[in-house]
Regions:
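Solvent-exposed, acidic/polar segments of extracytosolic/periplasmic ligand-binding ectodomains
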Residues: 29, 340-395
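Short, charged, surface-exposed loops that flank catalytic or proteolytic processing sites
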Residues: 322-334
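Periplasmic-binding protein-like
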Residues: 33, 88-101, 121-123, 166-171, ...
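Bacterial N-terminal signal peptides that target proteins for export
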Residues: 1-9
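Beta-alpha junction/loop-to-helix N-cap segments that form part of ligand/metal-binding clefts
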Residues: 28, 43-50, 58-131, 140, ...
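C-terminal segment of classical bacterial N-terminal signal peptides
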Residues: 7, 15-23
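Extracellular/periplasmic periplasmic-binding protein-like sensory domains
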Residues: 142, 241-311, 322-325, 370, ...
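Extracellular/periplasmic Venus flytrap/periplasmic-binding protein
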Residues: 83, 127-129, 136-244, 282-290
Length: 395
């Protein structure tokens, strides 16, 4: 009997050491990634996805656990995004949501965040409505509309060839475009910048033929255009404007950074677009230079603003989870407040006051690219750097 008990105990001990490799292994920390992978901004969504994936790979683990990304296509449609978010949280068990390209989608998700009860960090939404929107909603990514407008207006005022012009304002007809237009108009008025149409033009997102708008701009006599178009559309508009001879007389200022692959497709027609943004691969510091080469080696595509600020946003989220010490929603949210990541464009800090990031940014102009490892023919040349304090908002 004693021998039987001894054998039984030995078998039980053996089983304990055989099973735990899987049974007792730490479960991964699941993060839901919401980006547009089909439709008009699919390329921008892909670049965001690349940045987040690169951050997850380089971070490796949080809380000693694997980071597992669950990626869903929002199709830039708010109802679709909300449904996908519910799937990520309720079915997949994601502890945080990250990404989101458009302001409309971001605001729709924010309305449902109490029900979802997980932190949501956008790496691309630019609407000023995100400031202090909800205790679980954060921004660490593309400059907000007010920050972009400040950078663009500072750039205009510092350059006589831009300052002494009359601007025709045209935006995409949805929440982000309206907000971007309003922000520019307010600052233009404060700084004495002439505007032709204070009731700015609103173009449907699906617009492909810009000829009627270009004809109106030419007829107005304006010699500057302030445009708030989705990233991927900017080079399309510029190409058509060049075909109509508009660019010979007009300077283009953009409220969003143009996509690098679209710039390549537009070629010389895309020269001369000014705009404030977080970053371009012309930013020259050791961290930026190293990051862009790592990105290039991994994805074999031109490093983009969308990719880099999504990378930085993801790093802020992952580090906040580490700081929280667990995956509780309120604990992660508390850790996100005031967190800082020192990355390719310097320190990016999420303000504890309003849950939105503050960071330095650059004013760029698109032009022929110098020799570069990416084979790019067009690039965003850095003209000026703005400090986080200059861009605001004040805290």
């Amino acid at each position: 009997m004693k021998k039987f008990i001894t054998i039984t105990l030995s078998l039980m001990v053996a089983m304990v050491f055989l099973v735990p490799q899987n049974a007792l292994a730490k479960k991964p920390v699941k993060i839901g990634v919401l980006v547009p992978l089909t439709g008009i901004v699919a390329q921008g969504g892909l670049e965001m996805k690349y940045g987040i994936e690169m951050a997850a790979e380089e971070k490796g683990t949080v809380l000693g656990r694997e980071i597992k990304l669950f990626v869903e296509d929002t199709r830039v449609k708010p109802p679709v995004a909300v449904t996908k978010a519910e799937k990520l949280v309720y079915k997949d068990g994601c502890k945080a949501l990250i990404g989101v390209f458009s302001s409309g989608v971001g605001l729709a998700l924010s309305k449902n965040i109490d029900k979802l009860n997980v932190p949501f960090l956008s790496t691309h939404v630019m609407t000023t409505k995100f400031y202090n929107l909800h205790p679980l909603v954060f921004r660490s990514g593309q400059l907000a509309n007010d920050q972009t407008a400040v950078g663009n207006v500072k750039g205009i005022m510092a350059r006589p060839d831009l300052k002494d012009r009359t601007y025709y304002v045209i935006v995409h007809d949805y929440s982000w475009g309206h907000d971007a237009g309003e922000r520019f108009l307010a600052l233009a008025k404060e700084n004495g910048i002439k505007v032709y149409n204070n009731t700015y033009d609103k173009a449907p997102i699906k617009t492909k033929d810009w000829s009627s708008y270009i004809s109106k701009i030419k007829a107005s006599g304006a010699d500057g255009v302030y445009m708030a178009f989705i990233t991927n559309v900017i080079p399309v508009f510029a190409k058509q404007a060049a075909d109509f001879g508009l660019q010979d007389k007009v300077k283009l200022i953009s409220a969003a950074a143009p996509g690098p692959l679209e710039l390549e497709a537009g070629g010389k027609a895309c020269y001369g677009i000014f705009g404030a943004s977080d970053w371009s691969w012309d930013v020259d510091n050791a961290n930026s230079n190293d990051w862009e080469m790592r990105f290039w080696k991994k994805f074999k595509t031109i490093p983009s603003d969308a990719a880099v600020h999504s990378y930085v946003g993801a790093m802020n989220l992952f580090n906040a989870i580490e700081k929280a010490g667990n995956t509780d929603a309120k604990a992660i949210a508390a850790a996100l407040k005031g967190i800082t990541y020192d990355g390719p464009y310097g320190k990016v800090r999420i303000s504890a006051k309003d849950n939105c990031m503050r960071n330095d940014a650059v004013l760029t102009e698109t032009m022929a690219a110098p020799e570069n490892p990416f084979g790019a023919k067009v690039y965003m040349k850095v003209l000026e750097t703005f400090s986080a304090k200059e861009l605001g908002p004040a805290e």
